Amino acid sequence: MFKKVSAALLAAVVAGSALAVANAAESTGKGALDFTIDSPYKNVNWETFGQYKADFHAHSNESDGSPQPFDTVEEHYRKGYDVLALTDHNVTNTTWNRKDDPTGKGRTYLTDERYNEITNGTDRGGRGMVAIKNSDEQSKSDHLNTFFTPFNNSDGATLESNIAKCQELGGICHINHPGRYTGGKNTSGTAGEDASNNHATIQKYVDLFMKYDSCVGMEIINKLDGDSYSDRILWDNILEETMEDGRFVWGFSNDDTHSNAATGHSYNMMLMPENTATNVRAAMESGAFYASAKVAKREGYTNTNIDEINSYQPPVITNISVDDAEDTITIEGNYYNTVEWIADGEIIATGNTIDLNDYEGKINSYVRAQLKGNEGISFTQPFGVKSDIAGKANLSVDKNTVVVENDNKTVTCTVSVTNVLGANAFDAKLSYDSEVFEVAEVKALTEDTVISSDKSTDGTARMIIGTQTPVNGAADVMQVVLKVKEDAKTGITSLSLDSLNTTVSVTSDIFEGLLTVADGAKDIEVISYRELSDVNNDGEVTLKDLSLAVKNYRPENAAYDIDRSGVVDTADLIIIASYIA
């Protein structure tokens, strides 16, 4: 993967290169960088998978909600939910038809008959609603929803200790409404934004996500976007840090239901082959879902009148496709007007398709999309992005055989590049066996070379090169002439293009990285005509050796092919005869 370097460091070399890159990119349709896209939707079959509406944060009067537990379940079922986690504060939800009384408050749960009807969907066309069991909003500290985990926190618990316990027990969790604790919920001026951009705050969450992989994500929408007002800002800040190490943090949208009326406005669409608790967990872990909301205040959806928004339909995503060869992501859907693409917290593009090459310098480790419609917004999960300098490096040689008796016992090696765009600085390294070869010459082959610094050491030919004319397409970069040493042993020896580091200029940034070596290994045979002429290996060249070669005249027999031409011919016989005393 490339790294950014300061433009000032190479100012003398890169003058005019940005314009050259822009012109070349326009003509080729590709960029200076080659992207690898890691999509959380890569295993989703959009034609056969179902989309299942899920709420992972809901309350009843087991804690501070108003409905009975059975009614919270019924309301979600009535409103078309397919998945529900009942997450009362500090109460472990075991099953919706439980017979015990965990709170001692005499609460009412589903009957066994009704439980079976709802989970099997017998009165909803067979579309059952899946119960996420052993769920709990651990609330002794910053709130954390734990799933598939039979435990309840105790006094003195912290956010981290609850995450650690969840992981120890084999469950998963997500962090709830962080803006309540960070100050991100503050809507006064830039207070919420400033709180979500606070470095110490960001680092706190980054550290937790990096330490505990069972903490799969965080709420980016909670209820009608009250506490979560600035949590998308925090999410992007976290992603900037974690995605560099390949750590995805999924964004969840939940009603945090405390009343029946507050149900149905913020939810997650799980993409699964079948609606089962096992598949739900797999989707929560892999990111195979998107988050939808009718209210997202920073994005312009500010109507919180429940009577008005009850019938709203946020955008539905119907397909996401990634073309790694073209470095593109395409989204299709319904109920939307525009698709915005976000990297490092900034909207960088709009439209159904993003070509990452069009936004080089703006995309680092991730990009995500949000679909905006008249009645709400839907957020994709982040796509992981890794980038390398586009192009390939190659090694070629002028010969594959060197004769020690010849005056010209050298091999000329050429290091070249293909399909690069705007490359103007190179660091090429070629390794060889120092017991066989010595370097006779190293030189730059680039056009308008302004600097060539020989950094060769014993066994390695290396040169740093800078050119005023950036390379677009294919070019030879470095030439190395290797000479066979006088005391070199005969046999096969290998040459290797170890690396070719280069830079490209993209807008105001310079990117440095290794080109992929497409063809970088060459075997060279060092031969002695005198040794090979002794075909019977008796220590001397005599008529016997010539006789054997004559008998094998013309067949493709390497033992008698002295000059390595591919056939035994007159030239081989002449060589043998020349060594007969």
Label each residue range with its predicted role.
Residues Y77-D82, W96, Q167-E168, E240-M243, ...:
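Sec-exported extracytoplasmic/periplasmic mature domains
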Residues G29-E193, K223-L234, N254-T257, N279, ...:
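A metal-dependent hydrolase metal-coordination microenvironment
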Residues A25-A54, F70-V73, L144-T149, Q203-A390:
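Charged catalytic cores and adjacent phosphate/nucleic-acid-binding surfaces used
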Residues G104-R107, S365-K372, V415, I575-I576:
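Append "Rare intracellular matches occur via the same short Y/T/C beta-strand/loop motifs
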Residues I389-E531:
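Acidic, low-complexity intrinsically disordered segments
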Residues D498, V535-N557, S565-A581:
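Alpha-helical segments with a strong preference for the paired helices of cellulosomal dockerin domains
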Residues M1-E26, V480, V535, A549, ...:
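Gram-positive cell-envelope targeting signals
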Residues L395-N400, N536, I562-D563:
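Surface-exposed, proline-enriched loop/turn segments that connect beta strands in immunoglobulin-like
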